[in-house]
């Protein structure tokens, strides 16, 4: 471990030699600048961060690789940033030496919580916009987050080297939103490095230095924590007051637990141990703790002796918005799945889970996620990093059900839908912001109205781009709304959503019955108006997927005891007369009667085994017709 750490960034690179002043901690706060980059997916922030690493000389040319800060395979493969990363960079303006902390943030809507944590650790933000695409809904959401926290915003247009770039038009768009002049918008190219030097100079000039009391009790804010197999939990902190040194005892203020500080260091961009951290500095702490829940993101770290009494403000626990069941294909993998989820939780504070059993799928977990991408990525990581094969049930949101007698139930799983007289049901709502070219307004409005959306307002950002604001039930945007939106707008629309309370709705639970028995994995909660369509879709899909039996199998969709849709799987008929060559008709009749009796008995006692593939296919959103033939 240490060998690799010392070798990374050891000798000077081909460019400028690696400067030593940034490696010394306890820098004067006036010479520190903390900033993050806000951008939509694919607008080039990881590439811009790469250029900054090269320009400041902290990464040698031979060790450079694209998306240097995206450490997970899945991040590099999908080209998205999931975990917030941070790096300490040296920079000179004239003869003055500065230390810049760059905190790289995710851009996807599900990871807004990661962004809000990164923003807490900064004083400034670079608003990065693709000069060929313009501002997107997600960028706007993160920009408003940064404005709420009073960060200094530096607007920047990236990818100006592209032939399709139209910097003048988009500079006007940015100026319109941020209230600056179009001439103030910087123009850079992360790929070729044009304008990156000027951008770093602007960061030093515009972003305010961190403010804190160097002699007060130590207070540092945790903005991320990751799990390292060799060293336990590595906690990333930003020091606000006082100083933190190794070999001290520290206390986590939310849990009150005390730990020994084994190592304190900086990331530049590989971890380097240091003599401590002072006001405004960003670095990591290692306490030897094995459970990441002990170093909660957003918690305040202070000294155990003479520590602070007031924690830093600005943290909430992330609330899961989407629930889905995860089950191992092989039941014996259940303990492995439990350990895997425990380990993932070390890196992912927003993941919630509890054990559950399903008649159809066996033992598994009900997991809570921030959104669909978060769910997909968690599942991907479980399959990849732990070699598990999983089935996930269709995702659903959290409903509040009020019964006739006034009792309340919170439903995270259709199986727990209460029986009996229901007075009212409340479902979570979201505020959606959609940004798209203005020619697609009609198609977007039609889609949103079909999904029970209400138009809240509409703004033209420029003559050709429009921002639509809708209030919609979260259950409606969960499954394939984003795909439908993209296909109706030729891929140009971008979507962002935030929770906005709850609303009463006419919702029902649709059960799928096989031979009169409900299969819990297929139950779903839908709006009454869409129940017929859902029932019809599921029954016809299952008819294709369940193998034929020796007896007829009815597949029914029901609301309570009312059947709303039915399909039959025809029986396979064994030819019992094959052994009769000619012969008497009564002999044949006897065999046929016997078969009929057998079928009748089978029908009453026979059980239909639903194959795993049928579960997987039925729970995926695509229809059977779309599936490629094997």
UniProtKB/Swiss-Prot annotation:
Binding sites annotated in the UniProt record for GTP: 42-47, 158-161
Report the catalytic activity.
Answer: GTP + H2O = GDP + phosphate + H(+)
> Which GO biological process annotations does it have?
positive regulation of translation
Keywords on record: Cell membrane, GTP-binding, Hydrolase, Membrane, Nucleotide-binding, Protein biosynthesis
**What is stated as this protein's family in its record?**
Belongs to the TRAFAC class translation factor GTPase superfamily. Classic translation factor GTPase family. LepA subfamily.
Q: What does this protein do?
A: Required for accurate and efficient protein synthesis under certain stress conditions. May act as a fidelity factor of the translation reaction, by catalyzing a one-codon backward translocation of tRNAs on improperly translocated ribosomes. Back-translocation proceeds from a post-translocation (POST) complex to a pre-translocation (PRE) complex, thus giving elongation factor G a second chance to translocate the tRNAs correctly. Binds to ribosomes in a GTP-dependent manner.
PANTHER family according to UniProt:
TRANSLATION FACTOR GUF1 HOMOLOG, CHLOROPLASTIC (PTHR43512:SF4), TRANSLATION FACTOR GUF1-RELATED (PTHR43512)
Q: What is this protein called?
A: Elongation factor 4
Per the UniProt record, the lineage of the source organism begins with: Bacteria, Bacillati, Actinomycetota, Actinomycetes, Mycobacteriales
GN (gene name): lepA
């Amino acid at each position: 471990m240490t060998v690799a750490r010392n070798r990374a960034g050891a000798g000077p690179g081909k460019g400028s030699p690696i400067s030593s002043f940034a490696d010394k901690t306890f820098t004067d706060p006036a010479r520190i600048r903390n900033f993050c980059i806000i951008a939509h997916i694919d607008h080039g922030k990881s590439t811009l961060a790469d250029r900054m690493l090269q320009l400041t000389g902290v990464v040698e040319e031979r060790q450079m690789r694209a998306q240097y800060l995206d450490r997970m395979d899945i991040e590099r493969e999908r080209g998205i940033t999931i975990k917030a990363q941070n790096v300490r960079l040296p920079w000179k303006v004239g003869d003055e030496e500065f230390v810049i902390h760059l905190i790289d943030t995710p851009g996807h809507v599900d990871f807004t919580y990661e962004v809000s944590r990164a923003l807490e650790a900064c004083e400034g933000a670079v608003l990065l916009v693709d000069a060929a695409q313009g501002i997107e809904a997600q960028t706007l959401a993160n920009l408003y987050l940064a404005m709420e926290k009073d960060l200094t915003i530096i607007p920047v247009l990236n990818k100006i080297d592209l032939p399709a770039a139209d910097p003048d038009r988009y500079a006007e768009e940015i100026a319109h939103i941020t209230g600056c002049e179009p001439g103030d918008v910087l123009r850079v190219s992360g790929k070729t490095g044009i304008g990156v030097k000027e951008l770093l100079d602007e960061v030093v000039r515009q972003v305010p230095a961190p403010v804190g009391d160097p002699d007060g009790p130590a207070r540092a804010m945790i903005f991320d924590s990751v799990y390292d197999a060799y060293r336990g939990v590595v906690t990333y902190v930003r020091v606000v007051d006082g100083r933190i040194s190794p070999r001290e005892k520290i206390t986590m203020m939310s849990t009150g637990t005390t730990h020994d500080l084994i190592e304190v260091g900086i990331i530049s961009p590989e971890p380097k141990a240091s003599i401590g951290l002072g006001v405004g500095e960003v670095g990591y702490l290692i306490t030897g703790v094995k459970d990441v829940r002990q170093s909660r993101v957003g918690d305040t770290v202070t000294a155990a002796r003479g520590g602070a009494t007031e924690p830093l403000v600005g943290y909430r626990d992330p609330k899961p918005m989407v629930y889905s069941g995860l089950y191992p294909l092989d039941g014996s993998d259940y303990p492995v799945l439990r350990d895997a989820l425990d380990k993932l939780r070390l890196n992912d504070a927003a993941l919630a889970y509890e054990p559950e059993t399903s008649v159809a799928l066996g033992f598994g977990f009900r997991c809570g996620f921030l959104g669909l991408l978060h769910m997909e990525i968690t599942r991907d990581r479980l399959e990849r990093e732990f070699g598990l094969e999983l089935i996930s049930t269709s995702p659903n949101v959290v409903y509040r059900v009020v019964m006739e007698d006034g009792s309340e139930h919170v439903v995270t799983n259709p199986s727990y839908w209460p029986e009996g007289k229901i007075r009212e049901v409340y479902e979570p709502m979201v505020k959606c912001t959609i940004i798209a070219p203005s020619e697609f307004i009609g198609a977007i409005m039609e889609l949103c109205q079909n999904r029970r959306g209400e138009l809240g307002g509409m703004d033209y950002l420029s003559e050709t781009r429009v921002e639509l604001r809708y209030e919609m039930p979260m259950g409606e945007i969960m499954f394939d709304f984003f795909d439908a939106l993209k296909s109706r707008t030729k891929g140009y629309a971008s979507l962002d959503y935030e929770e906005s309370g709850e609303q009463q709705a006419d919702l029902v639970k649709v059960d799928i019955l096989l031979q009169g028995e409900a299969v819990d994995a297929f139950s779903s909660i839908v709006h009454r108006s869409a129940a017929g369509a859902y029932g019809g879709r599921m029954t016809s899909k299952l008819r294709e997927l369940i193998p034929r039996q020796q007896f007829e199998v009815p597949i029914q969709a029901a609301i309570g005891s009312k059947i709303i849709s039915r399909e039959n799987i025809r029986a396979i008929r064994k030819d019992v007369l094959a052994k009769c060559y000619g012969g008497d008709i009564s002999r044949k009749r006897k065999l046929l009667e016997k078969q009929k009796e057998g079928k009748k008995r089978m029908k009453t006692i026979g059980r239909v085994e639903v194959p795993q593939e049928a579960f997987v296919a039925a729970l995926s959103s695509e229809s059977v017709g779309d599936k490629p033939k094997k």
